[in-house]
Amino acid sequence: VLSLSLGVRIGLKSKELLKLGQAALLHDIGMINIPHEILKKETLLTEDEWEMIKTHPLNGVKITMDLMGLSEESAQILLAILEHQKSYDGSGYPEYIKNSKISLFARIIQIADFYDAVTTPKFHNLVPMSPAEAIAYLVKHSGKLFDPLLSKHFINLLGIYPLGTLVFLTSGEWALVIGQPQDPDKLHKPVVLIIKDANGVDIPQKLVDLSQSEIDIVRADSPWKYGIDPAEYLI
């Protein structure tokens, strides 16, 4: 979804969006060859385990070629699967790829995959970043790890406080960001769902558009640190 949203944001046509969507769905298919105990390991990987993880892009290409064959239509998808762990500056893996410029689809998927991985409790990610922390990391490493233009579009797409961010308000209440303001000059004032009082006790939920309120955000944090699953409130 994030990859497609970014593709729409930069103006890709429907045919390209279809291929981008396929690439995004299949980019980690090579993980099926990685032992389950490694994928679900909750401690740091050993060097050998990490080397096994790094085989998944090439494994993914092989699996996808068996499914789709090699053609002009599948070439972009296969290249994205192969390159999605490469960074904008050429670092990352597979190490043998020395292209100075990573393919567009791979650069899009890399950003979306990074954001999803660090903000969601998954294997090897014991303390997820808050959405705001992930955005700050994107900003800091834009032009190095991440395509700077795509990063800018992605950040504008999500807003300063992306959906699911836990925010602490000047009222003392806790809230989750559930929407972005219509006014682009008020990205610091999103729509929030107040869920707890100043003591962290559940209260009747209240929807507040901060762009229309005198209440401000004091700070943002990861909801997972406080045992809050945003999906319970956003779905």
Language model features: what each stretch is:
Residues 1-235:
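Histidine- and acidic-residue-rich, metal-dependent catalytic cores
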